[in-house]
């Protein structure tokens, strides 16, 4: 169990392996998306949230989750790949019992990283294989990459909802003096709060990357980022943050413009009244 300061939680379920490597594709197919495992993880997460209580700001367990299967294997002999040919690795990572096309095999094993002669890690979007006598560092990097992925996906969904709310607020409020109403003020503050919360979460997740000072761990994380398409979600989040900023800016500018126009009208009316008083006097 790992708890991250930016509001994420990772539950790790360890299952001892026995048997031959050729049986791993069938095992992978059984484990991927397994409802009982997901339920067990959510139960643990719920208990931890209840245990921490007031230490959590706005406690809630999101319906969104991300499961990721990692096979941590011990190296055997001098040839680490002797019992793990590319075709078998690909079937394990893709949880496929049958044969895969050559291009699928190449794609599945394309993200392979090694630190020494006695280890290697193959990362795919659905799972990974770590062959190492001390796999904890690699497992920690993979864990964080998946936390990063689900945070970006959650943030992307939240920003999508925020944009829809902002578009509705802008459409309702950009009609004349209505933009100065109390409701528009609430909408504007809400947009600003969403923008600040999203930007703070984005920075918190990315600042955590600074923990990977080791060059190999940084390279492993980069490989995981590419395979999990985290960069795509980050770009989407940044675009939506910019869109929110644009909407918020336009609402504020329009409010300033309307206030200036109303002030001009008030000044003109006051001058007219003053002149009227002088003429009648």
Where are the regions that the model predicts?
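Extended alpha-helical interaction modules
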Residues: 3, 14-178
């Amino acid at each position: 169990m790992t708890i991250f300061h930016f509001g994420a939680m990772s539950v790790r379920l360890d299952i001892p392996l026995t048997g031959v490597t050729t049986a791993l594709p069938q095992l992978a197919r059984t484990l991927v998306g397994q409802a009982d495992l997901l339920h067990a993880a959510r139960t643990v997460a719920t208990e931890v949230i209840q245990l921490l209580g007031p230490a959590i700001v706005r406690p809630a367990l999101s319906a969104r989750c991300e499961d990721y299967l990692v096979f941590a294997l011990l190296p055997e002999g001098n040839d680490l790949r002797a019992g793990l040919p590319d075709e078998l690795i690909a079937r394990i990572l893709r949880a496929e019992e049958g044969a895969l096309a050559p291009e699928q095999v190449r794609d599945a094993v394309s993200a392979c990283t090694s630190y020494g002669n006695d280890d290697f890690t193959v990362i795919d979007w659905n799972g990974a294989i770590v062959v190492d006598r001390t796999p904890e560092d690699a497992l920690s990097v993979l864990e964080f990459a998946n936390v990063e992925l689900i945070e970006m996906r959650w943030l992307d969904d939240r920003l999508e909802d925020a944009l829809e709310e902002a578009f509705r607020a802008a459409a309702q409020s950009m009609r004349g003096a209505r933009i100065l109403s109390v409701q528009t003020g609430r909408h504007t503050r809400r947009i600003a709060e969403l923008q600040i919360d999203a930007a703070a979460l984005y920075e918190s997740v990315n600042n955590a990357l600074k923990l990977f000072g080791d060059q190999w761990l940084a390279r492993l994380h980069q490989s995981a980022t590419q395979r999990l398409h985290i960069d795509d979600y980050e770009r989407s989040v940044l675009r939506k943050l910019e869109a929110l900023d644009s909407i918020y800016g336009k609402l504020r500018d329009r409010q300033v413009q309307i206030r200036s126009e109303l002030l001009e009208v008030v000044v003109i009316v006051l001058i007219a009244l003053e002149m009227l008083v002088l003429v009648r006097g």
